[in-house]
Amino acid sequence: MKRERGALSRASRALRLAPFVYLLLIQTDPLEGVNITSPVRLIHGTVGKSALLSVQYSSTSSDRPVVKWQLKRDKPVTVVQSIGTEVIGTLRPDYRDRIRLFENGSLLLSDLQLADEGTYEVEISITDDTFTGEKTINLTVDVPISRPQVLVASTTVLELSEAFTLNCSHENGTKPSYTWLKDGKPLLNDSRMLLSPDQKVLTITRVLMEDDDLYSCMVENPISQGRSLPVKITVYRRSSLYIILSTGGIFLLVTLVTVCACWKPSKRKQKKLEKQNSLEYMDQNDDRLKPEADTLPRSGEQERKNPMALYILKDKDSPETEENPAPEPRSATEPGPPGYSVSPAVPGRSPGLPIRSARRYPRSPARSPATGRTHSSPPRAPSSPGRSRSASRTLRTAGVHIIREQDEAGPVEISA
């Protein structure tokens, strides 16, 4: 009986250990499947350049693997599918001439575009293997950051101003992150320093003298970074501003006075020059008229003080006199020159003879005769006894005196 009981107990113990033995046997057997590994899980790409999605797989099978790359979207997009390195089917137009596969299953994307950004999944399967290997890699595509600059309305600000704004600007770059620096160090937490949600704009509220410093900004993204040149912000005290404004006003006033003082003499000089030119023009006109004026006796007081006779020779036989008839004698009622009286013509003149045109001779100096003295005409040459001289000429001098002198055989009286 004891022997039977011992055998039953040993059998029951064996049944209890059987599941554990079975599990142990399963774990020790080799698994038939593909194992995929990748050195990186995140790759940062640059627009226009290439990115390598690198993977490696291992399998007990020696058959060629079937590789499939997909871009995770709401609806997955198949990038490429191949047996080994041989592409199966037709590539999408977006990836044509930009795809290259390697023996280990890696994928090379050329000429990256912003649309290439996303999560890529690779699946590798082999016919003899039971399990399919999978792996995901994240790819980002960005544009490099161009050099930023700090933009301000003015580099000077008055103390206790309500707000002063600085803007960090750059032309190119995706996914930028901004950092503000004061004197080359990151800004400390200050209730007066306000940043916009994207930290691109810095606003200083209630400006103090301690805000007078150098400011710059730094912009970064996954592939590049840039730092602006520092900008000096000058804070003026209010009392200093009044001094600057008053000094500037005085300088401006002195400048205006100096300009006006220099401008007036030049204007006077211009007027003087115009007057001088006018006088020269008048002198030139006087010089042109002087020869004609010298042939006429002077009028006015000089004639009253020094009257003189004007002798005009007339040729009786000249044919010129026929064209120019003698002027009519002045009537008795017609007034003569003031201060003078002319005696009537002597009746010894031949009225029918033609009068020759007057020939003008230069004036000869003559002494002024005494008042009431009678002058006789100079004696004629004996070679022309039969020719009588007569002159009748009207002369206007200065628009005042008209003197008509007749030279006959008899004398001409000039009374004062």
Swiss-Prot record:
Its main location: cytoplasm. It is a single-pass type I membrane protein. Residues 262-416 are cytoplasmic. Coiled coil: none annotated. The chain crosses the membrane at residues 241-261. It holds the Pfam family Ig_3. N-glycosylated. The keyword Metal-binding does not apply. Residues 1-33 form the signal peptide. Residues 285-306 have a biased composition (Basic and acidic residues). GO terms for cellular component: astrocyte end-foot; cell-cell junction; cytoplasm; plasma membrane. Changing residue 92 to Q: In MLC2A; retains the interaction with CLCN2; loss of CLCN2 targeting to cell junctions. Glycans are attached at residues 35, 138, 167, 189. Homodimer. Dimer formation occurs predominantly through cis interactions on the cell surface. Part of a complex containing MLC1, TRPV4, AQP4 and ATP1B1. Interacts with CLCN2. Antibodies that recognize both Epstein-Barr virus EBNA1 and HEPACAM/GlialCAM can be produced when B cells undergo somatic hypermutations. HEPACAM/GlialCAM can thus become an autoantigen for self-directed autoimmunity and possibly contribute to the events leading to multiple sclerosis. The cytoplasmic domain plays an important role in regulation of cell-matrix adhesion and cell motility. This is Hepatic and glial cell adhesion molecule. The lineage of its organism: Eukaryota, Metazoa, Chordata, Craniata, Vertebrata.
